[in-house]
Amino acid sequence: MKKKYICSLLFFATICCFSISCDHGIEPKPILKSPPGFSGTIRFVSEWPDSVKRSFIVVFKNPLFTPADFTIENLKFLSREILLGVQMHDFSSLDSAYIPATPGPFPSGSYAYVAVVQQSTENLSLARKDWFVSGVYYANGDTTKPGTMVIPDSTFVKNINITVDFSNPPPQPPGGN
């Protein structure tokens, strides 16, 4: 009788342990409504210079205070080329880009410098001296300093809008011509 009681108690204890330790089993990760990233519109409000050979959207993680800040490690997004001569261009980090090389979710975090840049070189160059900033993202209309783009976890941020006025370009980061 005692043996039967101990076996029953042991069986009950084992069932309780399994019941308590099992939550939902192997559960899939929640499906994101939209992959994290950013989008916006660029408005070109003046005539395109003939010297422009290509135009891009760039995103830097850290501010560009010195020429040494302009590095490939700091450059987190380099769009494909914007068609020359357009008056408006819609963009998204989910579109194909040179950096990152494969489209997909863009990492959450703060990004200190989002801009439209032009080059006059025949070939794509990653040298700072070959880039001319023609438009900068400003947060909340504050045009005194570049705006920080903040992408919260699992969030797609819209309205990262930039106005490009070739007649009145923004201050250039250090290291340019």
Give the role of each language-model region.
Residues 33, 84, 106-108, 152-155:
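Surface-exposed coil/turn segments at beta-strand junctions on protein surfaces, enriched
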Residues 2-5, 16-45, 166, 170-177:
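Bacterial Sec-dependent N-terminal signal peptides
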Residues 10-15:
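Hydrophobic helical h-region of N-terminal Sec-dependent signal peptides
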Residues 120-168:
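Structured interaction patches on ligand/partner-binding surfaces of diverse proteins
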Residues 65-109:
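Tryptophan-paired
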Residues 47-77:
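Short, ordered, surface-exposed loop/turn motifs in non-cytosolic proteins
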Residues 102-126:
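A short, solvent-exposed beta-strand micro-motif common in secreted/extracellular proteins
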